[in-house]
Regions:
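Short glycine-enriched loop/turn motifs at secondary-structure junctions
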Residues: 12-15, 324-328
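A structural signal for short hydrophobic/aromatic patches embedded in well-ordered alpha helices
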Residues: 31, 344, 402-403
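SAM-dependent methyltransferase catalytic region
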Residues: 1-153, 158-162, 171, 175, ...
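Short cationic amphipathic helices and targeting signals
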Residues: 18-20, 331-334
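C-terminal substrate-recognition regions of SAM-dependent nucleic acid methyltransferases
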Residues: 159-327, 333-396
Length: 410
């Protein structure tokens, strides 16, 4: 095909079929140059809509604006978009660029669905699978898991497999929503350069377990567990005793820390100082949160450890005797006896326990809800992997998967 003919066809395609929503005025100019080069007489339909995130509070209205030809400097009837594709902005920066920054990609995905195209294909973070800020992502997660029009999804544990210079905590995924598709999703996981693919009902759980083989193990185990008989029911919530991560430096701390044990300051507190576990002392009367557990035997578990791909999954647990509390760095599990606490530690150290936690873990954080697929046991005795594999009827293949995935805690 001659160059003139190629350019003519591309010009016609741009005019009739390509419409780009840009997040900044500068992006409009970049889009024009990318699509049309220096053909200044060509029509390039790229628009910037001010305060677009505010407008997304009413997505039906915004969708009507986008389908209005006047928005794109065109005439005629309302536009019907056949496909929506893109890599939307991921988050509003809260200052740190970390996990507390508000996600916004879900708004663009929901807007795409509101436009009612035949196809949607977006690249977005995978954090919505099982974590993220619940008030912002829970409805989006529920909608995605129950959408039987999602025909394909590919998840990458390492975002650099897609964008070599960009690290996105929790990885990335892209998906295809096909209005004509109705049924299971062809799901692929790319991890360590290997791809595994399986047909999946995304709505099997209230989260999306990233690893298909692990999803099958979780399903088998949970079929044998009664409601509310899982470890999340005994693990504390965040900041369990109201003490921040480093009580010396935090301006939010209302508890005074002392480095010497005394009759007045008789409760030990485990906290993190310069990345080192440190013990100090506090007054019993200064603990206002979960004070009834001060005189119970406890197991302290780091709230954050490694990453969503870490083969250890949870941090090193620590037995805490009666008369102890911890900072925000840790969660805790209370027990009536030291033996029960130490037997729980034996359970936590098993690969069985930790692989079930990993089903929910997609970042470094491990809140109590991440223990929801781990069944409770009789803690009058210690536990081993061999006992647990037999108790829940795991196959040789399932055991081999766990053994290859999870490393022992030394």
């Amino acid at each position: 095909m001659e160059l003139d003919e190629t350019q003519r066809l591309w010009q016609e395609t741009l005019n009739a079929n390509v419409f780009v929503l840009c997040k900044t005025p500068m992006a409009v100019n970049i889009t024009r140059r990318t699509l049309a080069g220096y053909q200044d007489t060509w029509d390039v339909h790229a628009v910037y809509i001010p305060r677009i995130l505010d407008r997304m509070e009413d997505k039906p209205r915004l969708a009507r604006k986008l389908s209005n030809p006047k928005t794109w400097m065109k005439e005629g009837e309302r536009l019907k978009f056949d496909a929506v594709v893109g890599n939307p902005p991921y988050q509003l920066m809260g200052g740190s660029g970390g996990t507390n920054d508000a996600p916004i990609y879900q708004h663009f995905a929901e807007l795409a669905t509101e436009l009612n195209p035949t196809y949607i294909s977006l690249i977005i973070p995978s954090r919505w699978f099982s974590t993220g800020r619940e008030n912002l992502l829970s409805n989006f997660r529920n909608a995605m898991l129950t959408d039987c029009h999602i025909s394909k999804m590919v998840a990458y544990t390492d975002s650099r497999d897609i964008f070599p210079t960009v690290e996105v905590k929790g990885g990335l995924c892209y998906y295809l929503r096909d209005e004509k598709h109705l049924g299971d999703c062809e799901y692929s996981l790319v991890k360590d350069g290997q791809r595994q693919t399986a047909g999946r009902n995304l709505g099997d759980f209230d989260i999306l377990i990233r690893e298909p083989k692990l999803a099958d193990i979780v399903k088998k185990v949970m079929m044998q567990v009664k409601p509310n008989e899982t470890v999340d029911t005994i693990v504390s919530n965040d900041t369990p005793f109201g003490i921040p991560t480093n009580p010396h430096t935090s301006g939010k701390n209302s508890v005074t820390i002392y480095h010497t044990l005394s009759a007045e300051h008789d409760v030990s507190v485990l906290y993190l100082e310069k990345m080192t576990r440190t013990t100090a002392y506090v007054s019993r009367n200064s603990i206002k949160k979960n004070a009834s557990d001060i005189d119970k035997h406890k197991v302290f578990i780091p709230e954050a450890a490694g990453s969503g791909n870490d083969p250890y999954v949870v941090g090193k647990p620590e037995y805490a005797p009666i008369g102890s509390v911890c900072s925000q760095t840790f969660l805790y599990v209370p027990f009536e006896t030291e033996q029960e606490a130490r037997n729980f530690i034996s359970y936590l150290r098993t690969k069985f326990f930790r692989v079930l936690v990993s089903a929910c873990k997609i970042s470094q954080h491990t809140p109590s809800k991440n223990y929801r697929f781990v069944p409770l046991q009789d803690f009058s005795k210690p536990w081993t992997d061999a006992e647990l594999y037999e108790k829940y009827g795991l196959t040789d293949e399932e055991i081999a998967f766990i053994e290859a995935t999870i490393k022992p805690i030394e």
